[in-house]
Protein backbone atom coordinates (compact mmCIF):
# COMPACT_ATOMS: atom_id res chain seq x y z
CA UNK A 1 0.00 0.00 0.00
CA UNK A 2 2.83 2.39 0.87
CA UNK A 3 4.47 1.89 -2.53
CA UNK A 4 1.15 2.32 -4.28
CA UNK A 5 0.58 5.64 -2.54
CA UNK A 6 4.09 6.76 -3.45
CA UNK A 7 3.53 6.06 -7.13
CA UNK A 8 0.17 7.80 -6.97
CA UNK A 9 1.75 10.96 -5.58
CA UNK A 10 4.46 10.91 -8.24
CA UNK A 11 1.95 10.27 -10.99
CA UNK A 12 -0.25 13.18 -9.95
CA UNK A 13 2.69 15.56 -9.72
CA UNK A 14 4.29 14.63 -13.03
CA UNK A 15 1.24 14.57 -15.26
CA UNK A 16 1.97 17.91 -16.97
CA UNK A 17 5.50 17.12 -18.16
CA UNK A 18 6.42 13.49 -17.64
CA UNK A 19 4.67 10.20 -17.12
CA UNK A 20 5.54 7.03 -15.24
CA UNK A 21 5.91 3.86 -17.26
CA UNK A 22 6.78 0.27 -16.48
CA UNK A 23 10.25 -0.39 -15.23
CA UNK A 24 12.72 -1.57 -17.84
CA UNK A 25 14.46 -3.59 -15.12
CA UNK A 26 13.96 -4.69 -11.53
CA UNK A 27 15.04 -1.46 -9.85
CA UNK A 28 15.25 1.41 -12.34
CA UNK A 29 12.05 3.41 -12.50
CA UNK A 30 11.37 5.00 -15.82
CA UNK A 31 9.90 8.40 -16.66
CA UNK A 32 8.80 9.67 -20.07
CA UNK A 33 9.56 13.32 -20.75
CA UNK A 34 8.04 14.90 -23.84
CA UNK A 35 10.23 17.85 -24.86
CA UNK A 36 9.07 20.78 -26.94
CA UNK A 37 9.50 20.07 -30.66
CA UNK A 38 11.73 22.74 -32.16
CA UNK A 39 12.13 23.26 -35.88
CA UNK A 40 11.60 20.60 -38.50
CA UNK A 41 14.61 18.44 -37.71
CA UNK A 42 12.71 15.73 -35.87
CA UNK A 43 12.85 17.46 -32.53
CA UNK A 44 15.55 18.39 -30.08
CA UNK A 45 16.27 18.32 -26.37
CA UNK A 46 17.95 21.09 -24.38
CA UNK A 47 18.78 21.13 -20.69
CA UNK A 48 21.11 22.60 -18.08
CA UNK A 49 23.36 20.66 -15.70
CA UNK A 50 24.26 21.94 -12.24
CA UNK A 51 25.79 20.26 -9.22
CA UNK A 52 26.87 20.81 -5.61
CA UNK A 53 24.79 23.93 -5.16
CA UNK A 54 22.52 24.11 -2.09
CA UNK A 55 23.95 26.85 0.17
CA UNK A 56 20.97 29.18 0.68
CA UNK A 57 22.16 31.39 -2.16
CA UNK A 58 25.63 31.90 -0.72
CA UNK A 59 29.04 31.28 -2.34
CA UNK A 60 27.71 32.74 -5.60
CA UNK A 61 24.88 30.21 -5.82
CA UNK A 62 22.43 33.04 -6.55
CA UNK A 63 24.69 34.49 -9.26
CA UNK A 64 25.00 31.10 -10.95
CA UNK A 65 21.21 30.70 -10.74
CA UNK A 66 20.75 34.10 -12.38
CA UNK A 67 22.90 33.15 -15.36
CA UNK A 68 21.21 29.76 -15.59
CA UNK A 69 17.95 31.62 -16.02
CA UNK A 70 19.38 33.71 -18.86
CA UNK A 71 20.90 30.75 -20.71
CA UNK A 72 17.82 28.65 -20.02
CA UNK A 73 15.62 31.25 -21.69
CA UNK A 74 17.94 31.64 -24.68
CA UNK A 75 18.01 27.88 -25.26
CA UNK A 76 14.34 27.32 -24.38
CA UNK A 77 15.39 24.41 -22.17
CA UNK A 78 13.19 21.40 -21.53
CA UNK A 79 14.42 20.54 -18.03
CA UNK A 80 17.30 20.85 -15.55
CA UNK A 81 19.61 18.07 -14.32
CA UNK A 82 21.28 18.16 -10.92
CA UNK A 83 24.31 15.95 -10.33
CA UNK A 84 23.82 15.79 -6.55
CA UNK A 85 24.97 17.29 -3.25
CA UNK A 86 21.91 19.49 -3.40
CA UNK A 87 21.74 20.68 0.22
CA UNK A 88 24.77 21.47 2.36
CA UNK A 89 26.23 20.40 4.60
CA UNK A 90 24.47 17.08 5.25
CA UNK A 91 21.27 17.22 3.23
CA UNK A 92 17.77 17.84 4.57
CA UNK A 93 16.78 16.78 8.07
CA UNK A 94 13.19 16.15 6.98
CA UNK A 95 10.42 17.08 4.56
CA UNK A 96 9.80 20.38 6.34
CA UNK A 97 13.42 21.53 6.52
CA UNK A 98 13.43 25.21 5.48
CA UNK A 99 16.70 24.58 3.62
CA UNK A 100 14.67 23.09 0.76
CA UNK A 101 13.00 26.40 -0.01
CA UNK A 102 15.94 28.58 0.99
CA UNK A 103 18.39 26.67 -1.21
CA UNK A 104 16.11 25.62 -4.08
CA UNK A 105 12.70 27.26 -4.44
CA UNK A 106 13.83 30.77 -3.47
CA UNK A 107 17.05 30.65 -5.51
CA UNK A 108 16.09 29.21 -8.89
CA UNK A 109 13.29 31.67 -9.58
CA UNK A 110 13.78 32.50 -13.28
CA UNK A 111 10.86 31.64 -15.55
CA UNK A 112 13.06 29.41 -17.69
CA UNK A 113 13.96 27.31 -14.63
CA UNK A 114 10.33 26.54 -13.76
CA UNK A 115 10.72 23.22 -15.54
CA UNK A 116 11.15 19.68 -14.30
CA UNK A 117 14.33 19.15 -12.26
CA UNK A 118 15.72 15.62 -12.49
CA UNK A 119 17.92 15.32 -9.46
CA UNK A 120 20.69 12.88 -8.68
CA UNK A 121 21.48 11.92 -5.13
CA UNK A 122 24.71 13.12 -3.53
CA UNK A 123 26.91 11.34 -1.02
CA UNK A 124 25.41 12.70 2.20
CA UNK A 125 21.77 13.46 1.60
CA UNK A 126 18.22 12.47 2.34
CA UNK A 127 15.83 14.27 0.01
CA UNK A 128 13.98 11.37 -1.55
CA UNK A 129 10.59 12.04 0.02
CA UNK A 130 7.79 12.57 -2.53
CA UNK A 131 6.26 15.04 -0.08
CA UNK A 132 8.83 17.59 -1.22
CA UNK A 133 6.95 17.82 -4.52
CA UNK A 134 4.02 19.33 -2.65
CA UNK A 135 6.31 22.19 -1.68
CA UNK A 136 7.83 22.55 -5.16
CA UNK A 137 6.43 20.47 -8.02
CA UNK A 138 9.67 20.79 -10.03
CA UNK A 139 11.47 18.42 -7.67
CA UNK A 140 12.14 14.78 -8.53
CA UNK A 141 14.90 12.91 -6.70
CA UNK A 142 15.32 9.13 -6.57
CA UNK A 143 18.30 6.89 -6.00
CA UNK A 144 18.45 5.56 -9.57
CA UNK A 145 16.05 6.02 -12.48
CA UNK A 146 15.77 6.55 -16.23
CA UNK A 147 14.38 9.53 -18.14
CA UNK A 148 13.39 8.96 -21.76
CA UNK A 149 13.24 12.24 -23.67
CA UNK A 150 11.12 11.36 -26.71
CA UNK A 151 13.50 8.49 -27.57
CA UNK A 152 16.00 11.09 -28.76
CA UNK A 153 17.95 10.84 -25.51
CA UNK A 154 17.85 8.63 -22.46
CA UNK A 155 19.31 9.76 -19.15
CA UNK A 156 20.32 7.02 -16.72
CA UNK A 157 20.69 8.32 -13.16
CA UNK A 158 22.90 6.09 -11.02
CA UNK A 159 23.29 6.21 -7.24
CA UNK A 160 27.09 6.09 -7.07
CA UNK A 161 27.53 6.63 -3.32
CA UNK A 162 27.31 2.93 -2.29
CA UNK A 163 30.18 2.16 -4.68
CA UNK A 164 32.64 4.26 -2.64
CA UNK A 165 34.12 1.90 -0.08
CA UNK A 166 35.54 4.53 2.29
CA UNK A 167 32.03 5.82 3.03
CA UNK A 168 31.40 2.64 4.98
CA UNK A 169 34.62 2.87 6.97
CA UNK A 170 35.06 6.62 7.51
CA UNK A 171 31.78 8.18 8.66
CA UNK A 172 33.13 11.00 10.81
CA UNK A 173 32.68 13.87 8.33
CA UNK A 174 29.19 13.12 7.05
CA UNK A 175 26.00 11.29 7.93
CA UNK A 176 25.16 8.85 5.16
CA UNK A 177 21.68 7.69 4.22
CA UNK A 178 21.90 3.92 3.78
CA UNK A 179 18.18 3.20 3.79
CA UNK A 180 17.58 0.48 1.21
CA UNK A 181 21.26 -0.47 1.10
CA UNK A 182 21.52 -3.48 3.40
CA UNK A 183 24.57 -4.86 1.60
CA UNK A 184 26.71 -2.54 -0.57
CA UNK A 185 28.06 -5.42 -2.65
CA UNK A 186 24.60 -6.82 -3.38
CA UNK A 187 23.12 -3.36 -3.95
CA UNK A 188 25.80 -2.25 -6.42
CA UNK A 189 25.85 -5.60 -8.21
CA UNK A 190 22.09 -5.44 -8.76
CA UNK A 191 22.28 -1.80 -9.82
CA UNK A 192 24.99 -2.53 -12.38
CA UNK A 193 22.97 -5.44 -13.74
CA UNK A 194 19.84 -3.29 -14.04
CA UNK A 195 21.78 -0.45 -15.67
CA UNK A 196 23.40 -2.78 -18.18
CA UNK A 197 20.00 -4.21 -19.11
CA UNK A 198 18.50 -0.74 -19.53
CA UNK A 199 21.42 0.43 -21.67
CA UNK A 200 21.19 -2.63 -23.92
CA UNK A 201 17.44 -2.11 -24.36
CA UNK A 202 17.80 1.59 -25.12
CA UNK A 203 17.12 2.75 -28.67
CA UNK A 204 17.88 6.38 -27.92
CA UNK A 205 20.16 8.34 -30.22
CA UNK A 206 22.06 9.69 -27.22
CA UNK A 207 22.81 7.69 -24.08
CA UNK A 208 23.73 9.75 -21.04
CA UNK A 209 24.66 8.32 -17.64
CA UNK A 210 24.55 10.64 -14.62
CA UNK A 211 26.14 9.99 -11.25
CA UNK A 212 27.35 12.16 -8.42
CA UNK A 213 30.93 10.89 -8.32
CA UNK A 214 33.40 11.33 -11.14
CA UNK A 215 34.81 8.46 -13.11
CA UNK A 216 37.59 10.73 -14.39
CA UNK A 217 38.58 14.02 -12.75
CA UNK A 218 41.68 16.06 -11.97
CA UNK A 219 39.82 17.99 -9.28
CA UNK A 220 39.98 17.60 -5.49
CA UNK A 221 38.67 14.02 -5.30
CA UNK A 222 40.17 12.81 -8.56
CA UNK A 223 39.13 9.55 -10.22
CA UNK A 224 36.71 7.30 -8.34
CA UNK A 225 38.53 4.00 -8.68
CA UNK A 226 35.50 1.88 -7.80
CA UNK A 227 33.62 3.44 -10.73
CA UNK A 228 36.60 3.06 -13.05
CA UNK A 229 36.70 -0.64 -12.20
CA UNK A 230 32.99 -1.47 -12.10
CA UNK A 231 30.91 1.15 -13.94
CA UNK A 232 33.15 2.33 -16.78
CA UNK A 233 33.41 -1.06 -18.56
CA UNK A 234 29.61 -1.22 -18.80
CA UNK A 235 29.43 2.29 -20.26
CA UNK A 236 32.16 1.50 -22.79
CA UNK A 237 30.45 -1.71 -23.88
CA UNK A 238 27.06 -0.06 -24.41
CA UNK A 239 27.87 2.98 -26.52
CA UNK A 240 27.30 5.61 -23.85
CA UNK A 241 27.97 9.11 -25.16
CA UNK A 242 28.34 11.15 -21.97
CA UNK A 243 28.97 10.52 -18.29
CA UNK A 244 27.97 13.57 -16.23
CA UNK A 245 28.80 14.10 -12.56
CA UNK A 246 29.43 16.58 -9.79
CA UNK A 247 31.29 15.94 -6.49
CA UNK A 248 34.38 17.92 -7.50
CA UNK A 249 33.49 21.61 -7.23
CA UNK A 250 34.70 22.56 -10.69
CA UNK A 251 33.89 22.28 -14.39
CA UNK A 252 35.68 19.64 -16.47
CA UNK A 253 35.70 17.88 -19.80
CA UNK A 254 37.81 14.75 -20.28
CA UNK A 255 37.67 12.35 -23.25
CA UNK A 256 37.93 8.61 -22.73
CA UNK A 257 40.90 7.29 -24.76
CA UNK A 258 39.26 3.88 -25.24
CA UNK A 259 35.75 4.91 -26.34
CA UNK A 260 33.70 7.91 -27.51
CA UNK A 261 32.60 8.64 -23.91
CA UNK A 262 33.01 12.23 -22.75
CA UNK A 263 33.39 12.75 -18.99
CA UNK A 264 31.68 16.00 -18.01
CA UNK A 265 31.92 17.42 -14.49
CA UNK A 266 29.44 20.11 -13.46
CA UNK A 267 29.86 20.51 -9.71
CA UNK A 268 30.42 24.25 -9.48
CA UNK A 269 26.94 25.42 -8.50
CA UNK A 270 28.14 27.34 -5.44
CA UNK A 271 31.33 26.90 -3.42
CA UNK A 272 34.32 26.12 -5.64
CA UNK A 273 37.85 24.99 -4.80
CA UNK A 274 40.29 27.42 -6.38
CA UNK A 275 43.65 25.90 -7.31
CA UNK A 276 42.81 22.40 -6.05
CA UNK A 277 44.05 20.45 -9.06
CA UNK A 278 45.72 17.05 -9.35
CA UNK A 279 48.71 16.94 -11.67
CA UNK A 280 48.62 13.21 -12.38
CA UNK A 281 46.56 11.37 -15.01
CA UNK A 282 45.63 14.25 -17.30
CA UNK A 283 45.13 11.96 -20.28
CA UNK A 284 42.25 13.15 -22.44
CA UNK A 285 41.85 16.47 -20.60
CA UNK A 286 40.11 19.05 -22.80
CA UNK A 287 39.03 21.63 -20.24
CA UNK A 288 39.23 22.42 -16.53
CA UNK A 289 37.91 25.42 -14.60
CA UNK A 290 38.15 25.85 -10.84
CA UNK A 291 35.48 28.52 -10.42
CA UNK A 292 31.69 28.52 -10.21
CA UNK A 293 29.48 27.81 -13.19
CA UNK A 294 27.22 25.32 -14.98
CA UNK A 295 26.75 23.46 -18.25
CA UNK A 296 24.21 23.34 -21.07
CA UNK A 297 23.39 20.41 -23.36
CA UNK A 298 21.66 20.65 -26.75
CA UNK A 299 20.80 17.49 -28.66
CA UNK A 300 19.26 16.77 -32.06
CA UNK A 301 19.14 13.57 -34.10
CA UNK A 302 22.59 14.27 -35.51
CA UNK A 303 24.27 16.93 -33.36
CA UNK A 304 25.17 17.56 -29.74
CA UNK A 305 26.57 20.74 -28.24
CA UNK A 306 28.04 20.97 -24.75
CA UNK A 307 28.81 24.43 -23.35
CA UNK A 308 30.34 25.41 -20.00
CA UNK A 309 29.60 28.85 -18.50
CA UNK A 310 31.12 30.80 -15.63
CA UNK A 311 29.33 32.76 -12.90
CA UNK A 312 28.93 35.72 -15.28
CA UNK A 313 27.40 33.65 -18.07
CA UNK A 314 30.53 33.81 -20.22
CA UNK A 315 31.26 30.78 -22.39
CA UNK A 316 34.35 28.95 -21.15
CA UNK A 317 34.37 25.84 -23.33
CA UNK A 318 32.29 24.34 -26.13
CA UNK A 319 32.25 20.81 -27.54
CA UNK A 320 30.35 19.72 -30.65
CA UNK A 321 29.76 16.12 -31.73
CA UNK A 322 28.03 14.86 -34.88
CA UNK A 323 26.36 11.52 -35.55
CA UNK A 324 25.10 10.05 -38.77
CA UNK A 325 21.35 9.81 -39.13
CA UNK A 326 20.40 6.21 -39.84
CA UNK A 327 16.98 6.04 -41.50
CA UNK A 328 14.87 2.90 -41.29
CA UNK A 329 14.00 1.39 -44.69
What are these regions (language model features)?
Residues 50, 83, 120, 210, ...:
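Generic enzyme active-site microenvironment
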Residues 4-19:
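Cleavable N-terminal signal peptides of Sec/SRP-targeted secreted and luminal proteins
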Residues 285-329:
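A short C-terminal boundary segment appended to hydrolase-like catalytic domains
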Residues 20-99:
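N-terminal active-site segment of His-dependent metallophosphoesterases
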Residues 202-219:
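Short acidic, glycine-rich surface-loop motifs adjacent to enzyme active sites
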Residues 29-35, 88-205, 222, 226-242, ...:
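Extended active-site neighborhood of metal-dependent phosphoesterases/phosphodiesterases
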Residues 160, 210-214, 247-248, 309-310:
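Short, well-ordered beta-to-alpha junction loops that form the rim of enzyme active sites
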Amino acid sequence: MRMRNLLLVLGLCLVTTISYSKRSSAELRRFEHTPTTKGNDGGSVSFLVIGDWGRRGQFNQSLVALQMGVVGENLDIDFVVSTGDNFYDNGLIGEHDVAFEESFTNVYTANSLQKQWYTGKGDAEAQLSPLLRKIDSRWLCLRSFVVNAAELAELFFVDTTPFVEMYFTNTEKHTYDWRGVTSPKVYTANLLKDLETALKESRAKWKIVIGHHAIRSIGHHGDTQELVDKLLPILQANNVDFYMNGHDHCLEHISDPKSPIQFLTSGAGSKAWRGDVKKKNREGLNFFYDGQGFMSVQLTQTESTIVFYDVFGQVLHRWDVSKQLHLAI
